[in-house]
Amino acid sequence: MKKELFDLNLNKDIEAQKSDLNPQSASIVKTTIKASKKLCRGFTLTCGCHFTGKK
């Protein structure tokens, strides 16, 4: 539940940023967020995401 909620909030933030950024910058933001989500596994970071253990 928390993971889906985090993803929804993240998507809202991206949509809000799109209006301020040009498309290239928006894609860089998305790529950076994807990379940070991969690293955020098994522990909580300041980004607020929490995953339980590695598979």
From Swiss-Prot:
Cell inner membrane found in the keyword field: no
InterPro entries tied to this protein: Lantibiotic_typ-A_Pep5
Post-translational modification comment from the UniProt entry: Maturation of this lantibiotic involves the enzymatic conversion of Thr, and Ser into dehydrated AA by ElxB and the formation of thioether bonds with cysteine by the cyclase ElxC. The next steps are cleavage of the leader peptide by ElxP and membrane translocation by ElxT. The leader peptide may be removed before membrane translocation, in contrast to other lantibiotics for which the cleavage occur after translocation. This is suggested by the probable cytoplasmic localization of the serine protease ElxP that cleaves the leader peptide.
GO MF terms, alphabetically ordered: signaling receptor binding
GO biological process: defense response to bacterium; killing of cells of another organism
Prosegment location in residue numbers: 1-24
2,3-didehydroalanine (Ser): modified positions: S27
Sites of 2,3-didehydrobutyrine modification: T31, T32, T52
One Pfam match: Antimicrobial18
Keywords, in A-Z order: Antibiotic, Antimicrobial, Bacteriocin, D-amino acid, Lantibiotic, Thioether bond
Covalent link (Lanthionine (Ser-Cys)) residue numbers: S36-C40
Annotated function: Lanthionine-containing peptide antibiotic (lantibiotic) active on Gram-positive bacteria such as staphylococci, enterococci and streptococci. The bactericidal activity of lantibiotics is based on depolarization of energized bacterial cytoplasmic membranes, initiated by the formation of aqueous transmembrane pores.
Membership in a protein family: Belongs to the type A lantibiotic family.
Protein name per Swiss-Prot or TrEMBL: Lantibiotic epilancin 15X
Record lineage: Bacteria, Bacillati, Bacillota, Bacilli, Bacillales
Gene: elxA
